Amino acid sequence: MDCGSLVSADALIEPWEETTRTFGRGSIRVAVVDLGEPACCPQHFIVLLPANMYGGRICALVARNALVPNGWTHVGLHEAVSDRPEGGGLRITVPVYGYDPRTGTADPDSRRDISVLVRQAAGTVDLVASD
């Protein structure tokens, strides 16, 4: 979904060296954001593309739920990988972790891999798979 009014610069988590990565020869940036709610799972990630022919930079928010953007307890951006599928584009796969109410932290056994397909020329970011 479009970042729109949901994500502002103050949602970026610091240090940026640990919570942002670039893909596609540096033209595509993925960043972890903290939207503050819900308390158990406020982390999401955004995908930023360079400006297209229509204007400004493209920002896509990747959340667990599009209606009420719930996130995850932890987004493992340092474990993210990318590849180029046969149909074109760039697939970026980011592991995410759910909440463990027993410990109040991320549950290592709850790992899910979320994949998005980025088509930079078209200016699109689409969810393609989640475990």
Give the residues covered by each predicted segment:
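Exposed acidic/polar residues on beta-strands and adjacent loops within beta-sheet cores, strongest
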Residues: 1-131
